[in-house]
């Protein structure tokens, strides 16, 4: 399944969560597209709830179905809780950490920065958004890319860095200091439903 490249507000409204991180797309019309007015969302079956939760997490991180399933299966081979490990692996993606560091305003924008070669990891250019960053590795903006307006605007707008990251705004460099705990990951996701979905 190809990655969705259409307007994110449509997906946000359909799933009932903000994928932009701003929440603006839900403020004006907090109901699904095609529904005329803020009536009740139709009640979902157990399968429907599981599918919706999977789609919420998949679209949140901007991952296509093949990558999503592959990461899920990899998480199942790790010690500990399957769902929690799955979310930690998604959080460790390079494009996501570029976004978390405030170098991009959205994950989609972060993915473009990585793909276009503006990001380096431990001093080497990495242009693979799904690259898995390990604790202790540094993520920085290439020196030639530090004057990009899109990065400057993102840094000016950002006012929060998660505790599992450190960031030096002068160097435009951050470090993935440790793996995140479940309490530091998206609270609006019930990963147990996703485990149930793939266990059917």
Curated annotation (Swiss-Prot):
> A biological process (GO) annotation for this entry?
translation
What is the protein name for this chain? Small ribosomal subunit protein uS4
Protein family membership:
Belongs to the universal ribosomal protein uS4 family.
Biological role: One of the primary rRNA binding proteins, it binds directly to 16S rRNA where it nucleates assembly of the body of the 30S subunit. With S5 and S12 plays an important role in translational accuracy.
GO cellular component: a single term? small ribosomal subunit
| Cross-referenced PANTHER family | 30S 40S RIBOSOMAL PROTEIN, SMALL RIBOSOMAL SUBUNIT PROTEIN US4M
Subunit structure, per the record?
Part of the 30S ribosomal subunit. Contacts protein S5. The interaction surface between S4 and S5 is involved in control of translational fidelity.
The gene is rpsD
**One of the record's GO molecular function terms:** structural constituent of ribosome
Q: Which UniProt keywords are present, listed alphabetically?
A: Antibiotic resistance, Ribonucleoprotein, Ribosomal protein, RNA-binding, rRNA-binding
Residues annotated as domain S4 RNA-binding: 92-152
Provide the residue span(s) of the region labelled Disordered: 22-42
Read off the InterPro entries from this record.
Ribosomal_uS4, Ribosomal_uS4_bac-type, Ribosomal_uS4_CS, Ribosomal_uS4_N, S4_RNA-bd, S4_RNA-bd_sf
- Print the organism lineage: Bacteria, Bacillati, Bacillota, Bacilli, Bacillales
């Amino acid at each position: 399944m190809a990655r969705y490249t259409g307007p994110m507000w449509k997906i946000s409204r359909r799933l009932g969560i903000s994928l932009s991180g701003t929440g603006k797309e839900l403020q004006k019309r907090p109901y699904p597209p095609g529904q005329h007015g803020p009536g009740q969302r139709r009640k979902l079956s157990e399968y429907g709830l599981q599918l919706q939760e999977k789609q919420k997490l998949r679209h949140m991180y901007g991952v296509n179905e093949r990558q999503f399933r592959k990461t899920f299966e990899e998480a199942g081979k790790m010690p500990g809780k399957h769902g929690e490990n799955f979310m930690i692996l998604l959080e460790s993606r390079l494009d996501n950490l570029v976004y978390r560091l405030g170098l991009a305003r959205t994950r989609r924008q972060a993915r473009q920065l990585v793909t276009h070669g503006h990001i380096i990891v431990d001093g080497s250019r990495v242009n693979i958004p799904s690259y898995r960053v390990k604790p202790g590795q540094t993520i920085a903006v290439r020196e030639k890319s530090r004057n990009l307006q899109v990065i400057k605007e993102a840094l000016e707008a950002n006012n929060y860095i998660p505790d599992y990251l450190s960031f030096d705004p002068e160097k435009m460099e951050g470090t993935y200091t440790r793996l995140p705990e479940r309490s530091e990951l998206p609270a609006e996701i019930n990963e147990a439903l996703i485990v149930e979905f793939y266990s059917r």
